[in-house]
């Protein structure tokens, strides 16, 4: 009987130690937001690496399959249309363009709300041969964690005219 009481007490202690409300502490929540912000920021870094290396596959790795992309008055829907835009139209990906994509870090903006968030950044494309800025693009994205990975679900981009 004494053995049964000791086993019962041990089981109760074990369940108490392992139990809990299932809610994350404030510190754990804050840490999760920081981790998610870091993962969302990786989208910007991947975008610029893809643009600088003309790697359309890498660019597409940050887009959700059913994403939308607004460029001026045009709306692209889904991976196929977005891929075609980068492969055939986007300046940094065009043959003969040797551009490096740079982002002013102080202009990057990230928000996180659970499995959704936003990402804003600017791209300054510099022609390697001349060292001149040839294009500036502002990109505003909605992102979402899908199957554990943060992806762009919608984006809007605009290019202001540069003074000559």
Locations of regions flagged by a protein language model:
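Sec-dependent bacterial lipoprotein signal peptides
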Residues: 1-16
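Short, low-complexity N-terminal intrinsically disordered segments enriched in polar/charged residues
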Residues: 18-62
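Hydrophobic pocket/interface hotspot
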Residues: 47, 59, 67, 78, ...
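Sec/Tat-exported extracytoplasmic proteins
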Residues: 44-47, 51-55, 63-67, 86-94, ...
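A mature extracytoplasmic/lumenal domain signature
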Residues: 44, 63, 73-75, 121-125, ...
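Short beta-strand edge/turn micro-motifs at domain boundaries
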Residues: 22-24, 136-164
């Amino acid at each position: 009987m004494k053995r049964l009481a000791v086993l019962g007490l041990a089981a109760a202690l074990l369940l108490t130690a392992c139990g809990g409300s299932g809610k994350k502490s404030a510190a754990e929540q804050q840490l999760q937001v920081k981790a998610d912000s870091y993962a969302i920021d990786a989208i910007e870094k991947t975008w610029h690496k893809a643009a600088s290396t003309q790697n359309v596959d890498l660019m597409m790795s940050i887009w959700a399959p059913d994403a939308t992309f607004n460029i001026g008055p045009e709306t692209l829907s889904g991976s196929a249309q977005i891929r075609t835009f980068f492969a055939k139209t986007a300046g940094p990906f065009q043959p003969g363009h040797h551009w490096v994509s740079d982002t002013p870090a102080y202009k990057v903006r990230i928000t996180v709300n659970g499995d959704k968030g936003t990402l804003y950044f600017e791209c300054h494309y510099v022609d390697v041969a001349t060292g001149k800025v040839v294009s500036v693009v502002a990109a505003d994205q909605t992102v979402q964690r899908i199957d554990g990975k943060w992806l762009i679900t919608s984006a809007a981009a605009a290019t202001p005219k540069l003074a000559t």
